[in-house]
């Protein structure tokens, strides 16, 4: 499963895992792939590993897919989760297409997923880059409540969430193209465009981010 990434912290990953477990007929467990930084943070690393998460690299992705696991990845990475609120729901660049290569090598279908709701929980108004560099973080967000309210600023705003699972994109006929840069680029672009269009549909269904 390939989703858009947003919301300052990876709350969308948690919500996607819950949605998959609750909506899948067999209550499948989603194995999430995370950035190296996640596994260098003491508490977060432990929680992520206990929930079945692993480092986002092709070797681990292919190993999980070969064993029939359901794998979740967010190709935008920190570019998506740390973007400003003014750029909400505008997909960022999809890295080098590693998720496509892993899917092709294992013949695994790619399921694009659009997630609406994360952008509003911690709206990023500014990024204090000097402080982020000092703390060795990809960004240091300033939101309407953080850091002004201290720990209270970490409480997420109550946005309305919508998640759409798009039709799977088959890859079984493209196994021999796993090393073809053009095939990888085109397929990654197809996934990205599918998610972007789904986001537009969801936003039309949810005109008020905090409405019920």
Regions found by a protein language model. Name each.
Residues 63-212:
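Non-catalytic C-terminal accessory region of glycerolipid acyltransferases
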